[in-house]
Amino acid sequence: MAGINKVIIVGNLGNDPEMRTMPNGEAVANISVATSESWTDKNTGERREVTEWHRIVFYRRQAEVAGQYLRKGSQVYVEGRLKTRKWQDQNGQDRYTTEIQGDVLQMLGGRNQAGDVATHQNQAGWNAPASTQNNYNQGASNYNPNQTQAYSAPQTNRTKPAAESVMDNFDDDIPF
């Protein structure tokens, strides 16, 4: 039986993307994304929070998009897989790093956060569903020939989605 190696992260960038170019000319972007959990301690009633930092690497076109549009504080949705790579430090010692290799990058938040991304997206010829989120999938992984989708120009006046208002009132207590 084949295993599953899938990671889904929703969080905020801790720094601007670190951009590099590989010897073959392909772009590489490294980002650091914070995810937080908060809860109320049942014994003390004290509010607790734990933040985890995740190293994520994107290659090729996704790296270019990340470098162009993401900034410190940007909220992102990332799908990818865990990868461990081996490298040598300055002393020649073998080191290992486990990171997420990003396959899907979706910018969350509002248009004010990342600029006029949807307009740039349409001018570049990418297929952009009309929504408040901008999807930067690599390849055609979400293509379904039997499904029809309507595409439209970006809207300038967008209202806050109902799902966000539900989450604003969400009780963070752990149910067990």
Curated annotation (Swiss-Prot):
Positions of short motif Important for interaction with partner proteins: 171-176
Keywords of this entry: DNA damage, DNA recombination, DNA repair, DNA replication, DNA-binding
Alphabetized InterPro entries for the sequence: NA-bd_OB-fold (IPR012340), Primosome_PriB/ssb (IPR000424), ssDNA-bd (IPR011344)
Biased composition (Polar residues): 126-159
Disordered: annotated span: 126-176
Domain SSB: 4-109
HAMAP family: SSB
Name of protein: Single-stranded DNA-binding protein
UniProt organism field: Haemophilus ducreyi (strain 35000HP / ATCC 700724)
Lineage: Bacteria, Pseudomonadati, Pseudomonadota, Gammaproteobacteria, Pasteurellales
Gene name as annotated: ssb
